[in-house]
Amino acid sequence: MAGPSNQTQPPPPVLTQPSLSFTQGLLVGQLSVVLLIGAFIKFFIFGEAPPHPSRNGLSNRTSSHRRSYSLNSISADSSPRTLREKPSTSNILRPVPSSSTNTRSILRKTYYSATPTNPTSKHSRSRPHHSSHQPESLDWFNVLIAQTIAQYRQTAYILKDSPTSSILASLSEALNNPEKKPSFIDSIKVTDISLGEEFPIFSNCRVIAVEDPNSDGGRLQALMDVDLSDDNLSLAVETSLLLNYPKPFSAVLPVALAVSVVRFSGTLCISFVPGPGTSDQTMSPSPSPPKEASAENIAVDHQSPERQSARQRAPHQHKYTNTNTAGATAAATADDNDTHAKLPHGIPKTSLAFSFLPDYRLDLSVRSLIGSRSRLQDVPKVAQLVEARVQAWFEERVVEPRVQVVGLPNIWPRMGRTGVRGSQEETEAGAGGSAPADIPGTAGGDGVGVRGGGGGGGGGGGVGGSGGGSMRGTSGWGMGYDGLRYRHNAHGDGGVGAGPGQSAGAALYGGAQGGGGGGGRGGEEQFAIPGSMPDPVVVT
């Protein structure tokens, strides 16, 4: 019989008590969440914002040109103004710092380094030195200038039949000015005009500082090289030399001339002057005859009523949306003229002064034809006289130390000059290739014309008004004219006629007659000047 078991059962496990109670754990968890939220608010919401990307890039690109001030810094001499302070009526506009127009201050703020000039005794002017800044190529500027010149050429051709706004009328009026034309020269008739096909190329632009006693720290001047070559810019005229001794019209000598620009190159100087009065004294331009100014004023005053009437008719005649842009341009031009007329004479107006350095190059080609029965062609002395006169005309106007001063227009935004860009391409495509209705100079536009001219064998220009928006997409070669060359020939008056395949020299000398002239001015027309003419001779 088995005895009782000596085995003892193991003691039950002892339960460990937690070190923290449930309440304490809850408090610790809530506290940690609060700390995390507080840290997030402090470092992500109320923390300092990172610098702007553009400012970052600018600081990286111009690490050597650090600004010594910030937008929030206030200079020591200027007192801060709070919103609660009410300034007086005479102190609403804050004063401009005295160094705002200083040359060194402008160069420092624009990160441009220029070398000041040293005075020389020639013409009592300063000779500019090249700046230490890297010259610029001006490719973008060439594109803008080319578009502007192309627009002027196209507008001049469109307005060729206008009796008052055409370039032919302006040139004829300038060349036949009775106050400048000698008595021994008969009426000058323009027979051929070519506005060219190429565009000037600007390059190597640099900014220099020149000394100017009338401005603080001198003034800044931009120098750029310009070159125009292989262009077809020409003007052909015909007239007669009158021999008035011993009696009037004793003899008449027919003369025909054709002047072409072969190449022009030089250095263009551009600077801004404070106002017309100051610029006249500073730049010392040659005084112009008062008659020219009065004639121009009369021409502008004569055209102003037409501008006003055209502007009144414009809202009813414009058809396309992009016409508003051209109408706004014409209205802005008239508004600027009215604004300038209302400005007091004591208020200076910023002007643009430009000129060329004396080391320019102007190559001309002069063709001449003298006589009626026995004709002399390309007389060297005549070519020398004409070239010397053109060179003198150019130097008297835009060659240092003489400059041309042009007032800058008012560019403050106005509703009168506000326009809306329209889909002109779609409009022209829907018209089936026909001429758009918004071409300047046609019916339904603001027929604003600006006339210009030059004396002493100079030139002039006519710029047609807008009246219809931009001319984008309209090619000049698709309009039936060859290189913007306009050959004037009245009905049966013996002018120079040339066909599309005929050069200006061939038309001038009556040789190599081409066929297929357009508009009644065909290549079969022969050169005719007063007196009998033999058969045409081919020039070799």
From Swiss-Prot:
Give me the stretches of Basic residues compositional bias. Answer: 122-132
Annotated region described as Disordered, given as residue ranges: 52-135, 275-331, 416-471, 509-540
Segments on the Cytoplasmic face = 47-540
- Write one Gene Ontology MF term: lipid binding
| PROSITE patterns reported in the protein's UniProt record | SMP
Q: Does the keyword Transmembrane helix apply?
A: yes
Q: Which residues lie on this side of the membrane: Lumenal?
A: 1-25
Record's keyword terms, sorted: Endoplasmic reticulum, Lipid transport, Lipid-binding, Membrane, Transmembrane, Transmembrane helix, Transport
Principal subcellular localization: endoplasmic reticulum
The entry's localization annotation reads:
Endoplasmic reticulum membrane
> Known InterPro entries for this protein?
Mmm1, MMM1_dom, SMP_LBD
Composition-biased stretches, type Gly residues, lie in: 442-471, 511-521
Transmembrane intervals: 26-46
Membrane topology, from the record: Single-pass type I membrane protein
Instruction: Provide the family line.
Output: Belongs to the MMM1 family.
Quaternary structure annotation from Swiss-Prot or TrEMBL = Homodimer. Component of the ER-mitochondria encounter structure (ERMES) or MDM complex, composed of MMM1, MDM10, MDM12 and MDM34. A MMM1 homodimer associates with one molecule of MDM12 on each side in a pairwise head-to-tail manner, and the SMP-LTD domains of MMM1 and MDM12 generate a continuous hydrophobic tunnel for phospholipid trafficking.
According to its UniProt entry, the function of this protein is described as:
Component of the ERMES/MDM complex, which serves as a molecular tether to connect the endoplasmic reticulum (ER) and mitochondria. Components of this complex are involved in the control of mitochondrial shape and protein biogenesis, and function in nonvesicular lipid trafficking between the ER and mitochondria. The MDM12-MMM1 subcomplex functions in the major beta-barrel assembly pathway that is responsible for biogenesis of all outer membrane beta-barrel proteins, and acts in a late step after the SAM complex.
Protein name in UniProt:
Maintenance of mitochondrial morphology protein 1
Its ancestry begins with:
Eukaryota, Fungi, Dikarya, Ascomycota, Pezizomycotina
